[in-house]
Amino acid sequence: MIVLNALSYLGIVLGFIGMTVSIASALYYISEFVEEHSRLAKAFLCRLVYFIMAVMVFLVIFDGFPFWLSAFSIFSHYIYKINFDTFPFFSFKRMRFLLACFLIVANHILWVRFFQVHEFPIKPRGLTYDFVGQRLLTSRASFSQVASFMGVCVWSVPIGIFVSFTAADNTLPTITTPSSSSPDAYSSGSSRRTSNVLRQAYKKLGIFVERSLTSLGLSDRSSERYV
């Protein structure tokens, strides 16, 4: 089955490329949406933080998740939320933003280690041992369960913060001319110039995707040549 195996490898590669392009396109669309509807995006992220906090409490009560690790995650989302006071503007020099960046990495590492070593009882929540003293059957969380938890409770708010970097031209302090009138000149825009790296990266990615589709004959512009 040489040809069939080659087709399977080709399908895997094409699927990975398609998934990558889809994720990049979704991030670009979300960033444009945040730029046009910043208030709505801020309200959604704040309510998302409250929802995740409630989910963490329910996981501790009903599924036996560790209390201190869940409390740490709730505290992390509280730190994320207090950074929304200047949304969609973020200052890379503020301690609360640097703390939020540290908590994002710490949450990811701690929860990954938790799912690697922790086993859940197959029966409904209860003791690890039954009344006779025999050990209950346990199993680790499935991939879909881990991916869903990490995507909703760990990554969703940080991704929202990441895509909001492109919501304004003066968000990222990359190449700037500081103003002497205000220490918080990152939000003024009239006193300095800012090069928005993420916006340029998204636009270049969109141009690359459009050129790739044109070369494959899948774009409307390529069909106009033969009309």
Curated annotation (Swiss-Prot):
Its main location: Golgi. It is found in: Golgi apparatus, cis-Golgi network membrane. The chain crosses the membrane at residues 10-30, 48-68, 97-117, 146-166. It comes from the Eukaryota. GO terms for molecular function: COPII receptor activity. It is a multi-pass membrane protein. Signal peptide: none annotated. Pfam families: Erv26. InterPro entries: Svp26/Tex261. May play a role in retention of a subset of membrane proteins in the early Golgi compartments. Belongs to the SVP26 family. This is Protein svp26. It comes from Schizosaccharomyces pombe (strain 972 / ATCC 24843) (Fission yeast). The gene is svp26.
